[in-house]
Amino acid sequence: MLTDRELLILEEIVREYTENGQPIGSKTLMNNLPVKVSSATIRNDMAKLEEMGLIEKMHSSSGRIPSLMGYRYYVDHLLSPKKLNQSEAQQIQKGLGMHFREVDDIVRTSAEMLSNLTHYTALTLKPDQKDATLDGFRMVPLGGNQVMLILVSSNGDVTSQQFSIPRGMNSETVERVLRIMNDRLIGETLDQVYYHLKTDIPKIVEHYLHSNDGIIDIFENVVAQSSQDRYFIGGKLNILNFSKNVDVSSIRGLLTLFNENDQLDGLLGNNQSDLDVKIGDELSNALLKDFSLITATYDVGSRGKGLIAILGPTSMQYSKTLGLLDTFRDQLSNRMLEYYKHLDDS
C-alpha cells in the first residue's frame, strides 16, 4: 500500500519521464511536488518504490524511471485523461467534417489523423460486418474480356475485384449469372451469401448455363474480401522511432506485423473492453516488449462497433493519448452515424 506522498512521487516520475524522456532525481521531485518535503525523505520514498518494482535506475544516470510495473500501476490507479487543446479539437472536427464517399474513407482518414496527432502508429477498424446484408452485385465492363465485379452491402461498403471472363463464357453469360445471384441472394447476410455460393448456387448456375467454370470462385472471392476485417494503419514507420531493436530481422518483423491480418487479429482481436491499455509483455509478442497498446471501441448504434488503437512506446504520454482517443471516438461515432443516416435517406 502506497502513501499519498509515494503516489505523488510515482505519478510525477511517470509524468516527467513520459513528457521529457529523462530520468528523475530527488532534487527535481522536490521542486515539482505540490507538497513541501526534503530531498532525503524523497530518496527514502523512491527507495521503497524501487524495492516494490515500480521504478528502476538507469545505468547512465542517478535518476529513476518508471518500470513496466510502475506504468501498469499508474494506468490502473493514478491516470486521468488529459483534455485536448483547442487546436487538436479543431483538427479532429475539420478532418472528420470532410465529405466521404465510403465508410472505408472515414476509417482510413481516422488512422492518418490519429497518427499525425500522436506521432505514434494508429490502427483503425470499421464496425463489425457480420450483420451486413447484400444490397447487390454490379458488373462493369472494362474492355476486352476484363470485367469489374462490385459488391454493395447494406452498410454502404463497396468491394470490387477485376477479373477475366472465363473461357467458354461471354459478357452476356456473365450478366445472366449476375442476375441469378441478385435474384437469390439480395437481402442475405454476407455469411449466408458465402454459404450459398459454396452449396446450392453452383448447381443452380449449372442448371441454367450447363457450366459454372470459374465464375462462382470470383463471386466467392469478392464476398470473402468484403466480409473480412480490414485494418487501416497510419504512421507505420513511426514504430521504428521507438524500437530498441536495431537488427534487421526485428525491424522487418515489426513492419511485417502490419501486413498480416492474422497478426493484427491476434494483437487487437481480443480487446473487447470499451477502453483498454496493454503494456510491454502483456502484448504477448516479443517484438512489442518495448511498446504499449491503447484500444478504444466506438459505437455506431445498430451498425455495430468499430475499433481505434494507438501503438507507441511504453513511455508514451498515457494521459494525453487516452484523452485524445476518448474524444476522437465520440467524434468518429457521430460522423459515422451521420454518414449512415445520409445513406439511409438517399
Swiss-Prot record:
HAMAP family: HrcA. This is Heat-inducible transcription repressor HrcA. Signal peptide: none annotated. Pfam families: HrcA, HTH_DeoR. One of its GO terms (biological process) is negative regulation of DNA-templated transcription. GO terms for molecular function: DNA binding; DNA-binding transcription factor activity. Negative regulator of class I heat shock genes (grpE-dnaK-dnaJ and groELS operons). Prevents heat-shock induction of these operons. The keyword Metal-binding does not apply. It comes from Pediococcus pentosaceus (strain ATCC 25745 / CCUG 21536 / LMG 10740 / 183-1w). Keywords: Repressor, Stress response, Transcription, Transcription regulation.
